[in-house]
Amino acid sequence: MKLNRRMGRYLQDLRSREVGAAFAPRRPDVRIVETGGCFLLGGFLEKPHLSAADFPDQTGLECSANKLRMEAMFDARIASSCPLLLLTAGLVTARTVSEALSRYPGRFNVIVSYDGESCAVRFHKIRAGQRWLAEDLEGYVDEGVLVFEAGTAVPFPALLSA
């Protein structure tokens, strides 16, 4: 697992909070489908809004098509008044995505990005010669970025363990 300093600060802030509310054990419904060598969200396949021809490689397509925006899961007033709720939802969603990817052969990157106002979870298959994230995560100065590997026989990062 890799993360930049900004994400480290967000996670430290999240850990320092005490929330006096019960957490619902229900997780987001994530359905992943393999098609044409790509691993895509089922919802994207039902309503595609991107074309593979618009991307230089499969990894770029996957990262754009497989973007789950946490603010779409909540009423706008809740999201704006409790922004760390979005990061919490992102971490829960990342674990759910990781579990779904463990059913497929190969290795995948699961990426969580959070800027204090919005949070997104993305994923892509790890392929030789294809990158989506910069090697140095500190270059993402406007957002916290966390990335970890998922797939068969890849353990969950301790941060995501129940």
Regions found by a protein language model. Give the residues of each.
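Alpha-helix capping and helix-coil boundary motifs
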Residues: 16, 79-82, 141, 146
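Alpha-helical context
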Residues: 46, 50, 73-77, 86-88
